[in-house]
Amino acid sequence: MISSANNKGAGTSRRKLRSEKAALQFSVSRVEYSLKKGRYCRRLGATAPVYLAAVLENLVAEVLEMAANVTEKHKRIVIKPRHIMLAVRNDVEVNKLFHGVTISASGVVPKTRKELDRRKRRSTSQAD
């Protein structure tokens, strides 16, 4: 007879995490813990943390993609808080979502008034 001590791990399989099942990078367990700790509701469904982790992962991916585009536009390699802020503030939908958020060490959004612009711009009324 073959003892089970000789076949360690042959029949055993590792538990699959909920993040792995949903193919997510964000930890579903950590999101669930935050939801429970925050006491946002008395009861929490089993799929709510999975869905929220997926939404957060999608939002972070979108913001990072926009920040990477801003970084490339400024001919830089490293994404800095300034690039994240410029990306967020220049996108209407994401800016609405991040309305009350202050990004540390990012500066302000540059706004140039048309009167101070050195280049003469033709208005649309003069073109006709």
Swiss-Prot record:
It holds the Pfam family Histone. Its main location: nucleus. One of its GO terms (cellular component) is nucleus. The keyword Nucleus applies. Expressed in the generative cell within the bicellular pollen. Not detected in other reproductive or vegetative tissues. Keywords: Chromosome, DNA-binding, Nucleosome core, Nucleus. One of its GO terms (molecular function) is DNA binding. It is found in: Nucleus; Chromosome. The keyword Nucleus applies. Core component of nucleosome. Nucleosomes wrap and compact DNA into chromatin, limiting DNA accessibility to the cellular machineries which require DNA as a template. Histones thereby play a central role in transcription regulation, DNA repair, DNA replication and chromosomal stability. DNA accessibility is regulated via a complex set of post-translational modifications of histones, also called histone code, and nucleosome remodeling. May be involved in the repression of gene expression in male gametes. The nucleosome is a histone octamer containing two molecules each of H2A, H2B, H3 and H4 assembled in one H3-H4 heterotetramer and two H2A-H2B heterodimers. The octamer wraps approximately 147 bp of DNA. Belongs to the histone H2A family. This is Histone H2A.2. It comes from Lilium longiflorum. The gene is gH2A.
